[in-house]
């Protein structure tokens, strides 16, 4: 993700600000009537796809008799349900929310949207998840055509082949018992131990140095345990995953906003200029993509971005509060967010402010606190910005010239090959050591294909992914070290800052962004 300015106050939390681009301007348009949405949907080009994963037949619950038509987000006949759409069928999730093995907080992400890609990319055995879904009440006459459609990972021949080999060669059947969600416990203890020790040092003597050391701990939390926990990949116990995810709040972020921004928007639509908020949320300050309009100052962004990166943490704060008030991150609406989750956000913010500002000010005075807090904010921000930004912002993942990556992204989000998209739009660097310190974010390709698998398994999975891509002639991007990919990122930012705007070549639009 472009964590660099993901919730920029300058770029704006509202869709109107993003409307400076032709693609994102859809977010500011009035909501289309149902008939209009259907007409837009019909313009999508259809292409042949791989045979989807076979799902065992399950006994389906009788459809609920409800009136036809209506707006599923506003009409009472639909809003009383916790509805989701999977492969063209609407289901009521209410009976299953508290029984979901991954926890209700994860299933909430599916409410109010087509969650096909979420379901299929989060389950190593998607046939089991689909079978359970088919036991839920079906909402008859639900206006499915009014819901922005989701990509379908199971229709990707590449993704199916990789997943099958991962199940057989890496987990050998143990995924049935949840082995794929474990293995990172040692890393969690290391991260928490370091963060606790640095906080003790910070409260003992608050100054820029101890603040910077604590900032490294905050960044390490952001890269590893909160990230893995919010994906439900730290443990087979959803409570553990939730607690690890909440460390994001203590470190200064928001686990709730992260899940919608990162998992609903970025992961499903990686590097899509209209649907991945990491592409456009820093605009107009930073231009991460040549499909965005070009301003004169973008030619210098590879220089001045380093003056912006230290303020990423402050951007998080502004963006999280704005999203809470507007019920929307830049790229995803909080349809399923519960009142408890919202209250947790507020409590987490207050706890963070007390730990970083309140207690040190009480112990050492405001001057010492400000110096220490500045060290924390700047260090955490720079580490997160630099580490996250390189994964999707190099020439291989966002080429300025024609090629397979641009061809894939020029298709509509619904019809493009989802598995191929994740490979083409992500880049890896380093190996096992980088995997430990970044929570698997250095192996970004594997993380995007399997977000719900513990990062400790990514090195083994990467060999399978590289082999399957080689067999099909699909580019697989890997840099040897972080400095190497970081240097290429800087050069890319210079190149894209000077590049002319490229039109988006898509045959038709498939959704109203304001309802995504």
From Swiss-Prot:
It is an enzyme of class 1 (oxidoreductase). Its cofactor is Fe(2+). It is found in: Plastid, Chloroplast membrane. It comes from the Eukaryota. It is a multi-pass membrane protein. The chain crosses the membrane at residues 186-206, 209-229, 305-325, 354-374, 375-395, 423-443. The lineage of its organism: Eukaryota, Viridiplantae, Chlorophyta, core chlorophytes, Chlorophyceae. It comes from Chlamydomonas reinhardtii (Chlamydomonas smithii). Coiled coil: none annotated. GO terms for biological process: long-chain fatty acid biosynthetic process; unsaturated fatty acid biosynthetic process. This is Acyl-lipid (7-3)-desaturase, chloroplastic.
């Amino acid at each position: 993700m472009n964590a660099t300015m993901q919730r920029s106050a300058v770029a704006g939390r509202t869709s109107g600000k993003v409307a400076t681009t032709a693609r994102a301007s859809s977010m500011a348009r009035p909501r289309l009537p149902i008939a209009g949405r259907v007409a837009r949907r019909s313009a999508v080009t259809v292409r042949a796809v791989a045979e989807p994963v076979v799902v065992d037949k399950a006994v389906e619950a009788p459809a609920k008799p409800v009136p036809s038509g209506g707006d599923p987000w506003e009409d009472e006949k639909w809003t009383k349900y916790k509805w989701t759409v999977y492969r063209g069928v609407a289901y009521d999730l209410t009976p299953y929310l508290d029984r979901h093995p991954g926890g209700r907080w994860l299933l909430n992400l599916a409410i109010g949207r087509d969650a096909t890609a979420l379901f299929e990319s989060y389950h190593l055995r998607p046939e089991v998840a689909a079978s359970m879904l088919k036991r839920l009440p079906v909402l008859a006459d639900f206006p499915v055509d009014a819901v922005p459609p989701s990509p379908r990972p199971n229709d990707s021949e590449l993704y199916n082949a990789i997943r099958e080999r991962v199940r057989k060669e890496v987990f050998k059947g143990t995924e049935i018992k949840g082995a794929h969600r474990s293995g990172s416990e040692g890393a969690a203890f290391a991260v928490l131990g370091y963060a606790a020790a640095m906080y003790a040092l910070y409260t003992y003597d608050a100054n820029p140095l101890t603040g910077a050391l604590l900032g490294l701990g905050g960044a390490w939390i952001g890269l590893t345990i909160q990230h893995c926990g919010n994906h439900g990949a730290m443990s087979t116990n959803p409570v553990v995953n939730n607690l690890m995810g909440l460390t994001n709040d203590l470190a200064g972020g928001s686990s709730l906003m992260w899940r919608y921004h990162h998992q609903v928007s970025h992961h499903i639509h990686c590097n899509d200029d209209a649907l991945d908020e990491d592409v456009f949320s820093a605009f107009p300050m930073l231009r991460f993509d040549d499909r965005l309009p070009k301003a004169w100052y973008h030619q210098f962004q590879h220089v001045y971005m380093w003056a912006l990166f230290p303020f990423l943490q402050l951007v998080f704060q502004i963006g999280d509060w704005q999203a809470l008030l507007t019920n929307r991150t830049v790229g995803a609406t909080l349809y399923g967010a519960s009142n408890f989750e919202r209250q947790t956000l507020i409590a987490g913010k207050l706890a963070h402010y007390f730990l970083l500002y309140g207690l040190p000010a009480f112990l050492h005075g405001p001057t010492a606190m400000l110096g220490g807090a500045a060290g924390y904010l700047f260090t955490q921000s720079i580490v997160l910005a630099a580490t996250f930004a390189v994964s999707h912002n190099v020439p291989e993942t966002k080429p300025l010239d024609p090629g397979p990556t641009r061809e894939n992204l020029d298709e509509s989000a619904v019809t493009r090959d989802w598995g191929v998209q994740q490979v083409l739009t992500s880049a890896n660097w380093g190996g096992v050591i980088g995997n430990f310190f970044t929570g698997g974010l250095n192996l970004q390709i594997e993380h995007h294909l399997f977000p719900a698998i513990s990062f400790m398994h990514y090195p083994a999975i990467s060999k399978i992914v590289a082999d399957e891509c080689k067999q099909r002639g699909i580019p697989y991007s890997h840099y040897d070290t972080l400095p190497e990919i970081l240097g290429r990122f800087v050069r890319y930012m210079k190149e894209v800052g000077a590049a002319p705007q490229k039109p988006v070549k898509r045959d038709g639009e498939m959704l109203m962004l304001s309802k995504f």
